[in-house]
Amino acid sequence: MVTALSDVNNTDNYGAGQIQVLEGLEAARKRPGMYIGSTSERGLHHLVWEIVDNSIDEALAGYANQIEVVIEKDNWIKVTDNGRGIPVDIQEKMGRPAVEVILTVLHAGGKFGGGGYKVSGGLHGVGSSVVNALSQDLEVYVHRNETIYHQAYKKGVPQFDLKEVGTTDKTGTVIRFKADGEIFTETTVYNYETLQQRIRELAFLNKGIQITLRDERDEENVREDSYHYEGGIKSYVELLNENKEPIHDEPIYIHQSKDDIEVEIAIQYNSGYATNLLTYANNIHTYEGGTHEDGFKRALTRVLNSYGLSSKIMKEEKDRLSGEDTREGMTAIISIKHGDPQFEGQTKTKLGNSEVRQVVDKLFSEHFERFLYENPQVARTVVEKGIMAARARVAAKKAREVTRRKSALDVASLPGKLADCSSKSPEECEIFLVEGDSAGGSTKSGRDSRTQAILPLRGKILNVEKARLDRILNNNEIRQMITAFGTGIGGDFDLAKARYHKIVIMTDADVDGAHIRTLLLTFFYRFMRPLIEAGYVYIAQPPLYKLTQGKQKYYVYNDRELDKLKSELNPTPKWSIARYKGLGEMNADQLWETTMNPEHRALLQVKLEDAIEADQTFEMLMGDVVENRRQFIEDNAVYANLDF
């Protein structure tokens, strides 16, 4: 029995008349990248989101509250919802059942005509038809009109007419599909964590909906996670602040509509210094911000300044806070739903609707102002926090000037310890951040000076999780990095000015090296996050061991490799093993051959796939709450490779 189907048979005039047809499907198999972005692992998972988005649309319209996603044996995907069921009556223009039109004609669906869905999610909106076209097999079961309807397809082509296969007292839709290996040549295997992260996010963004993910590929080890948040994004903010010290117990929360735009905002300040602002439009994470973010920021700054001056916490007009000051230590989520969202920007993740700015500004400012006057103690704490941030900003401005590099060609302002590369083309340039001066010397001698720059870092950099920007910019190692990268920092950050498109962290393979690596990643995440999002940050993989047998040398990168090599080698001639404790133990040639030569090296690219996990991990590892850190170490100690 399918658990997600609904007992309520409420079709509410959702029929073939609401299905609008725009164009044919022929192009989808020829040029799949145009419709789903790519045919890589990312594109494969996009197929799931296209089907899930349709179920979310039913939920947003008020007709579904349960969605189930199952990874079946052989990487089939099954998505079930308890909505009204896709219409099965004949669609007038095509003369075919509406469900068949939706699954075989590109851009045919309830989200395009305006009569079916008021608001719909999904960035591409390419819908079920493209999933069908890019699937080796697809099946649909519709529970509607007390009847179960069924149709099957191969590569988008119906195998038989829609037929009745049983009776039912439920409503809803079940779609099963298997991605076509001829199109997804890289992989057709789904990653549970990738699906889990987005499903949890969707459950937060659509409060009250229960979304279940189940992995049935291993019969003896079935995995299941179910997400249901009555608090919606309010619960999301509480989760993000879990390892922080909030300065008010409950997040400030608003959920209102104006001019057919639904606005939901949750905000909570904590004692830290980092800002964590996530924005969404129709469930799409708008990484590049947009008009909803602009309206929120404008209202926040104006209302806090107005309150600070009228309550005499701020003495004069000249004490006004900047936007950056008002957002210090703030965790906030903005989610809007719009009938016709306009996405722009480099990755189509920036909201462009100008009318949204005014609506968000008005709704949030009224609510926030009321909150401040009703909670004077919290209001004072927030304003005073902003005043402290303003003082730090003035101090940081002086320090920031020192880090400014006018352009990629500006050599005069470069830090003295930097051995820059001669190429001025950022796409081919890489900079190695090397632990210690001695290792820095070896890497400088062993590098390709045309494309590889070296910046030695002395000792551990500052833990930015516990510091304001003025203190951070007074740290010599951090200042040198900012100057070398050329991007600026914080509000001044500009990815287009990056001098290097590969920033490689190169530390010793011991506990100290791991700590320095974590400090650097914390700095990049908190103050230069676009570098990570653009895929510019890497971690070098220097060898752990050198195994010598006669004149033959083998470099080994982990214990598993070492065990494998030892089992394969002849016992004679006798071999010896040396463990590298640090980069400084390798000469220039060895460093080049094992760690820096693009032909042979292994680099780990740092990816940001789950903002919640990343934020919580950095806060827990580098923040003030010792108990959470201790628990993490105890839970993960079995995986650690400790070097005493």
Curated annotation (Swiss-Prot):
One of its GO terms (biological process) is DNA topological change. Gene3D superfamilies: 3.30.230.10, 3.40.50.670, Histidine kinase-like ATPase, C-terminal domain. SUPFAM superfamilies: ATPase domain of HSP90 chaperone/DNA topoisomerase II/histidine kinase (SSF55874), Ribosomal protein S5 domain 2-like (SSF54211), Type II DNA topoisomerase (SSF56719). PROSITE patterns: TOPOISOMERASE_II (PS00177), TOPRIM (PS50880). A type II topoisomerase that negatively supercoils closed circular double-stranded (ds) DNA in an ATP-dependent manner to modulate DNA topology and maintain chromosomes in an underwound state. Negative supercoiling favors strand separation, and DNA replication, transcription, recombination and repair, all of which involve strand separation. Also able to catalyze the interconversion of other topological isomers of dsDNA rings, including catenanes and knotted rings. Type II topoisomerases break and join 2 DNA strands simultaneously in an ATP-dependent manner. GO terms for cellular component: chromosome; cytoplasm. It is found in: Cytoplasm. This is DNA gyrase subunit B. Few gyrases are as efficient as E.coli at forming negative supercoils. Not all organisms have 2 type II topoisomerases; in organisms with a single type II topoisomerase this enzyme also has to decatenate newly replicated chromosomes. It catalyses: ATP-dependent breakage, passage and rejoining of double-stranded DNA. Its EC number is 5.6.2.2. It comes from the Bacteria. Keywords: ATP-binding, Cytoplasm, DNA-binding, Isomerase, Magnesium, Metal-binding, Nucleotide-binding, Topoisomerase. Residues 429-543 form the Toprim domain. Binds two Mg(2+) per subunit. The magnesium ions form salt bridges with both the protein and the DNA. Can also accept other divalent metal cations, such as Mn(2+) or Ca(2+). Mg(2+) 2 binds at residues 508, 510. The record marks 460, 463 as: Interaction with DNA. Its cofactor is Mg(2+); Mn(2+); Ca(2+). It comes from Staphylococcus aureus (strain COL). Mg(2+) 1 binds at residues 435, 508. GO terms for molecular function: ATP binding; DNA binding; DNA negative supercoiling activity; metal ion binding. Belongs to the type II topoisomerase GyrB family. InterPro entries: DNA_gyrase_B_C, GyrB, HATPase_C_sf, Ribosomal_Su5_D2-typ_SF, Ribsml_uS5_D2-typ_fold_subgr, Topo_IIA, Topo_IIA-like_dom_sf, Topo_IIA_B. Heterotetramer, composed of two GyrA and two GyrB chains. In the heterotetramer, GyrA contains the active site tyrosine that forms a transient covalent intermediate with DNA, while GyrB binds cofactors and catalyzes ATP hydrolysis.
